């Protein structure tokens, strides 16, 4: 089944979700809303991308709408989500990627315009969070607003699940070495709530907070309170890497751990958790659609119960692909209950 999807917010994730949708057989983007971008500029921003290259296809503007690969995509410029007429295009599922409407109440405004479900492309304080390959099967169709969690949680959770299912995680700490994002500064500037975050992104390694590790406890309840973490923002434009250090109950050699992760990447988590023994660096992962790419040669163990694991992720491309995979999955569940 092909799911008709609308995107609210044509920023970094909104555009990368759109690009991914071109490669996704189950998804058709039928409408986009962004009050700060006019259609001609939206065409330009979709066509050219400094990180992921030029758009592979045709894009044009027809009136106030986009035409992508010969198909019309309605373009709206509404500030109020409740005023977007999603029903005009049959957009049943909405990607909420503004970064503004991240609560159930705020994101529910899309339902007034005819949307059936809203998927927030960010963590949410109160909407149920789902991570593909981890807890998506717990979705029962009852929630109209859900969250795809964060890019870091999508990298960490599948790996943590495999380790916990096989060796039982006692406790752990995570550091994500994370590329800079749009919220950071090009030069030193005011940032009253996060002084370090106000320093220039391209010149500094900047320690920062992240809720990604604690959020794993929401999608894997058994790990609630057992993981926490932090972030180091670094001067790279894209691709990040999780460093997960855990104490495990069932002792195992590093080779045994590698084998378990490799097996999972070829089985139930194929396409979500990937595995490599190549001598890779961050740029090699640019455009990788997996949520988490386990780097077998980068990890180390101190003993059979204490291990450091390393997993890469394209925090833009891989995450955006999961947003669409989640939509495809929930649409099938919803259809089965109709």
Curated annotation (Swiss-Prot):
GO BP of this protein: glucose metabolic process; glycolytic process
Cross-referenced Gene3D superfamilies: Dihydrodipicolinate Reductase, domain 2, NAD(P)-binding Rossmann-like Domain
Major subcellular location class: cytoplasm
Catalytic activity, EC: 1.2.1.12
Subcellular location: Cytoplasm
Transmembrane segments: none
Keyword Cell wall biogenesis/degradation listed: no
Residues noted as binding D-glyceraldehyde 3-phosphate in the record, renumbered to the chain: 150-152, 181, 210-211, 233
Catalytic activity: D-glyceraldehyde 3-phosphate + phosphate + NAD(+) = (2R)-3-phospho-glyceroyl phosphate + NADH + H(+)
PROSITE patterns: GAPDH
Record's keyword terms, sorted: Cytoplasm, Glycolysis, NAD, Oxidoreductase
Keyword NAD: yes
Catalytic residue positions: 151
Pathway(s) served: Carbohydrate degradation; glycolysis; pyruvate from D-glyceraldehyde 3-phosphate: step 1/5
Site (Activates thiol group during catalysis): 178
Domain of life: Eukaryota
First-level EC class: oxidoreductase
One GO CC term on file: cytosol
Chain sites annotated for binding NAD(+): 12-13, 34, 79, 315
GO MF terms held by the record: glyceraldehyde-3-phosphate dehydrogenase (NAD+) (phosphorylating) activity; NAD binding; NADP binding
Subunit structure of this chain's protein: Homotetramer.
Family listed: Belongs to the glyceraldehyde-3-phosphate dehydrogenase family.
Name of the protein described by the UniProt record: Glyceraldehyde-3-phosphate dehydrogenase
Organism: Sordaria macrospora
Organismal lineage: Eukaryota, Fungi, Dikarya, Ascomycota, Pezizomycotina
Gene: GPD
């Amino acid at each position: 089944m092909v799911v008709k999807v609308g995107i609210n917010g044509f920023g970094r994730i909104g555009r990368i979700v759109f690009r991914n949708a071109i490669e996704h057989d189950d998804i058709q983007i039928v409408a986009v809303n962004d009050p700060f971008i006019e259609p001609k500029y939206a065409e330009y921003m979709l066509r050219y991308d400094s990180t992921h290259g030029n758009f592979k296809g045709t894009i044009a503007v027809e009136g106030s709408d986009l035409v992508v690969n010969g198909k019309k995509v309605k373009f709206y410029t509404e500030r109020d989500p409740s005023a977007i007429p999603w029903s005009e295009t049959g957009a049943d599922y909405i990607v909420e990627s503004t970064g503004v409407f991240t609560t159930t109440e705020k994101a529910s405004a899309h339902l007034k315009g005819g949307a059936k479900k809203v998927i927030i492309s960010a963590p949410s304080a109160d909407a149920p969070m789902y991570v593909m390959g981890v807890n998506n099967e717990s979705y029962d169709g009852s929630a109209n607003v859900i969250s795809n969690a964060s890019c870091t949680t999508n990298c960490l959770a599948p790996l943590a699940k495999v380790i916990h299912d096989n060796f039982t995680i006692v406790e752990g700490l995570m550091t994500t070495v994370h590329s800079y994002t749009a919220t950071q500064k090009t030069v030193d500037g005011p940032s009253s709530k996060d002084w370090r975050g106000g320093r220039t992104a391209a010149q500094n390694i900047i320690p920062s907070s992240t809720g990604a590790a604690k959020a794993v406890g929401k999608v894997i309840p058994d790990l609630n309170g057992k993981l926490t973490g932090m972030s180091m923002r670094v001067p790279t434009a894209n691709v990040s890497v999780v460093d997960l250090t855990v104490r495990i109950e069932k002792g195992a050699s590093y080779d045994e751990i590698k084998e378990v992760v490799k097996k999972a990447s070829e089985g139930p988590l194929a396409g979500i958790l990937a595995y490599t023994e190549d001598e890779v660096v961050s740029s090699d992962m640019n455009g990788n659609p997996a949520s988490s790419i386990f780097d077998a040669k980068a990890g180390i163990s101190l003993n059979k119960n204490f291990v450091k694991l390393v997993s890469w992720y394209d925090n833009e491309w891989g995450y955006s692909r999961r947003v669409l995979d989640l939509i495809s999955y929930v649409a099938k569940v919803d259809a089965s209950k109709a």
